[in-house]
């Protein structure tokens, strides 16, 4: 569907944070979206919380995995189920600013851009914003990304009508970086918005999270 954004969210034992994550999507000023949350066999109350949220907003749906597959495979399963031309990524313990999608989709459609990302803010485990903002450069090519892997997955939007279909590679780590390189290798540079539209939550190593998954 034209200009529909499919938001891909892997979830693993994120009961403490999933409400903030999903509510930040529901609060978006841009309303043409669907959110696909893949629960990767959580052992906490994540599924119950997601079910409650999906009952509030029909644009949210959950895919429950019976075995643990890891974040890359969870994202790939969601990609196969996604209906949108635009694909966005948001981990279950992160959250967006309300105008994130509106600003990013407008930017991409006006300039016919295939791959964009934004600056993002580091938050505490409780979600309090710090002064630490990871600033997005205006443009990143394949060669420059090899030297500076600055793209935050929680900020990325890709127009797959332009890039063609894609999946995350089945590797143990850095699968997002590998995918960005693949997209750039196809000839699509990544363009950055300097405003921070997303919030990256730092979780302690004692908590099980998709960031550590």
Q: Can you name each region flagged by the protein language model?
A:
Residues 1-27:
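N-proximal low-complexity "stem/linker" segments adjacent to membrane-targeting elements
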Residues 16-19, 44-52, 75, 95, ...:
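Acidic helix N-cap motif at the loop->helix transition within catalytic regions
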Residues 24, 39-48, 67, 91:
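A conserved acidic beta->alpha catalytic loop
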Residues 65-82, 103:
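Glycine-rich, basic loop-to-helix element that forms the pyrophosphate-binding segment
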Residues 87:
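Short aromatic/hydrophobic "clamp" motif used to bind/position activated sugar donors
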Residues 91-95, 119:
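The conserved acidic donor/metal-binding loop of glycosyltransferases
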Residues 99-130:
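Conserved donor NDP-sugar-binding/catalytic core segment of glycosyltransferases
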Residues 136-213:
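Conserved nucleotide-sugar donor-binding catalytic segment
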């Amino acid at each position: 569907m034209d200009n529909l954004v499919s938001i891909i969210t892997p979830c693993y034992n994120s009961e403490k944070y999933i409400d903030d994550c999903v509510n930040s999507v529901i609060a978006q000023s841009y309303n043409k979206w669907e959110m696909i949350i893949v629960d990767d066999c959580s052992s906490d109350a994540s599924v119950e919380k997601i079910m409650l949220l999906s009952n509030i907003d029909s644009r949210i749906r959950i895919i429950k995995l019976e075995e643990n597959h890891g974040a890359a495979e969870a994202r790939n399963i969601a990609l196969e189920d996604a209906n949108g031309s635009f694909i966005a990524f948001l981990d279950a313990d992160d959250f967006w600013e309300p105008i994130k999608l509106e600003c990013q989709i407008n930017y991409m459609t006006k300039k016919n851009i295939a791959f964009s990302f934004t600056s993002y803010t580091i938050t505490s485990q409780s979600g309090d914003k710090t002064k630490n903002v990871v600033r997005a450069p205006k443009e990143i090519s394949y060669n420059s990304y090899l030297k500076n892997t600055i793209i935050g997955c929680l900020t990325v939007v890709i127009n797959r009508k332009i890039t063609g279909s894609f999946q995350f590679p089945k590797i143990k780590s850095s699968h997002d970086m590998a995918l960005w390189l693949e997209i750039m290798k196809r000839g699509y540079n990544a363009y950055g918005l300097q405003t921070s539209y997303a919030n990256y939550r730092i979780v302690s190593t004692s908590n099980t999270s998709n960031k550590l998954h």
